[in-house]
């Protein structure tokens, strides 16, 4: 039965102790010893559970708190599953390959850096994966840069910036969905609000890349064979025509008109399935398998496919989201128990004693995000926990929670790839062949978002108020 006897609020030390334990476990276990984050989050939840018992609650209270927290974010979790389905069908239907194909054909030496920014951004928006776009199209651009004797650090920075621009704004991205869910904001409303900081950062990045590219002394070298091979293979595998863009148009229409996300994505996936069967001539079995388990180039029987193209196309499917869902369940369980204990209320009250303006609240959010990503090295947790902790603080200050979701992404999602010790930083450095600290100055979008967030916090521009 549920608690019927007296409970109490935690002291300040008790309130902060679960957060401290979580940071220590993730900082030591995940960052230093490469242990999986999920069991570390579960241990943190168990510790928070002991605190809850000490405060007078019972086991059923804990279960109810966890269930309630997960139930509130279930729509976003269902969107993540639908995103996996969408990516798999878009690849089998030829939508994503068509975008990549025409992007690769548009490469010009003087505009190499800005083209890398735009194309990786487009691919990342369409796929919702920064790692995927950097590991495929990004690698192709690094090959082009080597062939043209271009600045490799600048090229890598442009690739990373483009990849995370798309990841940040894509309705298919896990972090975008998690940020909106953590703050309790509609997905498309969150994406629209992100433009205040992300678009100026993108324009600044593009301007720097254009000016630098036009003033860089390029040798008159042809496009590297690696890129030509990828273009040729895409021509052999897919039949390209404007019908392949209908799934993208549907998602854009849904975003502009603010239609329910899941039905829009399912409609887009359905059209992509029709394209895959009627235009690309894949079997119904292969297309359904792409939707569930992800596309695999072994489904292509009429021509051979290189390992580079396989890396580009082998992705998607509902099952690809299971790892993300697992970490979400673990983090939400921790947040649910933390909320039951009253620790979040105590923490917020303590924070509000130092927060006297919109600017100080924005800076507090940024510091929380930077601390979480720097210590835990996990972008999803770094968005979820600050979102849960600070949501009520924004409401109490009369600020819309979408300011929180935007700032959480500015200080966590796009910061991760420019920190050498994070998984994203290590992946980008290893994949692109350029050290993290070398491409950091050129990944302008990744660090300038925080600057714009602080400017908006100080000026009040782009800060949404709660409607009374």
From Swiss-Prot:
Major localization class: membrane
UniProt keyword list: Antiport, Cell membrane, Ion transport, Membrane, Sodium, Sodium transport, Transmembrane, Transmembrane helix, Transport
Membrane topology: Multi-pass membrane protein
Oxidoreductase as UniProt keyword: no
Any single Pfam family the record assigns to this protein: Na_H_antiporter
GO function terms (MF aspect): sodium:proton antiporter activity
GO cellular component term, pick one: plasma membrane
Entry's localization field: Cell membrane
Membership in a protein family: Belongs to the NhaC Na(+)/H(+) (TC 2.A.35) antiporter family.
Cited PANTHER family: MALATE-2H(+)/NA(+)-LACTATE ANTIPORTER, MALATE-2H(+)_NA(+)-LACTATE ANTIPORTER
Protein's name according to its UniProt entry: Uncharacterized Na(+)/H(+) antiporter HI_1107
Lineage: Bacteria, Pseudomonadati, Pseudomonadota, Gammaproteobacteria, Pasteurellales
